From Swiss-Prot:
Binding sites annotated in the UniProt record for S-adenosyl-L-methionine: 76, 78, 82, 117, 145, 201-202, 218-219
One example of a Gene Ontology biological process annotation: methylation
Lineage of producing organism: Bacteria, Pseudomonadati, Pseudomonadota, Gammaproteobacteria, Vibrionales
Reactions that this protein is recorded to catalyse: L-glutamyl-[protein] + S-adenosyl-L-methionine = [protein]-L-glutamate 5-O-methyl ester + S-adenosyl-L-homocysteine
EC number: 2.1.1.80
The CheR-type methyltransferase domain, residue ranges: 1-275
Keyword terms: Methyltransferase, S-adenosyl-L-methionine, Transferase
UniProt GO molecular function: protein-glutamate O-methyltransferase activity
InterPro entries: Bact_Chemotaxis_MeTrfase, CheR_C, CheR_MeTrfase, CheR_N, CheR_N_sf, SAM-dependent_MTases_sf
Identification of the protein by name: Chemotaxis protein methyltransferase
Length: 275
């Protein structure tokens, strides 16, 4: 029987490793999360215990295992049109405002997870184009994630009924999806064409991504240390075009982290504009 217990020292060593690799801070009491996320890898990599796995990850003995462990720890659940208001603001305020510049609109989904956020953006763009023909120039959405398995899922664009039921209306499901068999649905090509998926560690440089008019970095900063939050936010400020916008998660704030943005109150919600 595989041992799935870990010592306090093993947990601390792995926590330091994870923060150094991708900025995620586990804190003092997330042993249960490490066990639940990494235990399946013990059998997959033919190890005898979770302790052996953590040792090999921390020491770098097995690069493939390291990648798999980071992948497992950075995979998070998400929803279609999460919190609703960011997509309302995108449609009713941000897209029209940026469109007035008469140049292509560039949007970044900074932690795309399994694709619900960037595809929700793409659906919002298509709905706006239908509602206001000719208003929008071309729109390009870049969606990034650190997890290779999540990016593969994003690119496939195939979801089961459980995933589809989390925030997606029957109307949008009918318009933007097609049958993929086995009770699953696939994002239509006109939605997929708007989104380019690529790997990105938020601890590393964003320079190769280019500049954006709008950045969604929602429900990501909550996992980072204050120093890491500041680093990410200041890099994102440098990645925005003049007057660009940043949207955070409903429980996230810039207070004490950066002075490069001004808060803009919407109805509902709050967004941030580059100074």
């Amino acid at each position: 029987m595989t041992a799935i217990t870990i010592s306090d020292q093993e947990y601390r060593d792995f926590s330091r490793f994870l923060e150094s690799q991708c900025g995620i801070v586990l804190g003092d009491s997330k042993q249960y999360l490490v066990r639940s996320r990494l235990s399946p890898l013990v059998a997959k990599f033919k190890l005898t215990s979770l302790s052996d796995l953590l040792r090999d990850v921390v020491t770098g003995r097995n690069r493939e295992l390291r990648v798999a462990a980071v992948d497992a720890m950075t995979t998070n659940e998400t929803l279609w049109f999460r919190d609703a208001y960011p997509f309302t603001v995108l449609a009713e305020r941000l897209l029209p405002e940026v469109a007035a510049n008469k140049r292509p609109i560039k949007i970044w989904s900074a932690a795309s997870s399994s694709g619900q956020e960037p595809y929700s953006m793409a659906m919002t763009v298509l709905e706006t184009q239908q509602r206001k023909p000719g208003m929008l120039p071309s729109v390009a959405i870049t969606a990034t994630d650190i997890s290779a398995s999540m990016l593969d899922m994003c690119k496939a664009g195939i979801y089961d009924n459980l995933a589809l039921g989390r925030g997606l209306s029957p109307e949008r499901r009918k318009i933007f999806f097609e049958d993929a068999g086995d009770g699953r649905m696939k994002i239509k090509d006109n939605v997929k064409r708007l989104v380019n998926f690529r790997p990105q560690n938020l601890m590393e440089s964003y320079a190769l991504l280019g500049k954006f008019d709008i950045i969604f970095c929602r429900n990501v900063l909550i996992y980072f240390s204050p120093d890491m939050k500041s680093k990410v936010l200041n890099q994102m400020a440098s990645s925005l075009n003049p007057g660009g916008y940043l949207l955070l998660g409903a429980s996230e704030s810039l207070t004490g982290l950066t002075d490069k943005f001004e808060m803009v109150r919407c109805n509902p919600g709050i967004i941030y504009k580059l100074k």
